[in-house]
Amino acid sequence: MTAPRYDVDAIATVEEYLDRSDWRVNANANQGYSLGGLILNSAGKIVANYWLEHVYTPEIGAPHREGDYHIHDLDMFAGYCAGWSLKRLIQEGFNGVGGAIASAPPRHFSSACGQIVNFLGTLQNEWAGAQAFSSFDTYMAPFVRLDNMEYDEIVQCMQELIYNLNVPSRWGSQCPFTNLTFDWTCPDDLADEHPLIGDEVVDFTYGELQREMNLINRAF
């Protein structure tokens, strides 16, 4: 089976976005109607056609074109969701790419929140779906202890974190798609481990930080 070739009409693609006649304009509630949205929508058509003509076989691509079924996120030539190690980000800092801006390991709760925002926002540009960190309260609790933070200070940092994660900074004027999960109590495999903060091993363990974890969870 040989698939027919489909060419994307550049003029029609732009005009369909501008007058909102293309269903894709409203397909994603997180995507704003904007110049970035126009660029993403136009490029997405090209990528979707690449999938259908050069990745999927005609037996798979043709039924999609004919409406027998729908292949989701064809405009994203990327993996879907990814989970990352918050522990590693805290220990190493946001770096590792030559020629790009880099940061040393965070030493404070606020700077750790900033690196989380930048990490998730940057990695989001390489994936179609959510970017996730697990054990947020466990790994962030040492900063609360070291910074001797009060509840109101934690609330302020969490407000900034949540707000900044929802700024439409992703391509197409979207906000990053992010997930944070919380342990509520320290996992057994971390209870006796001493955190590494700012390249220094602290004199307490994760298991001794239940009070600090409670403050983080309450603030969130």
How does the language model describe each region?
Residues 1-220:
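Catalytic alpha/beta active-site cores
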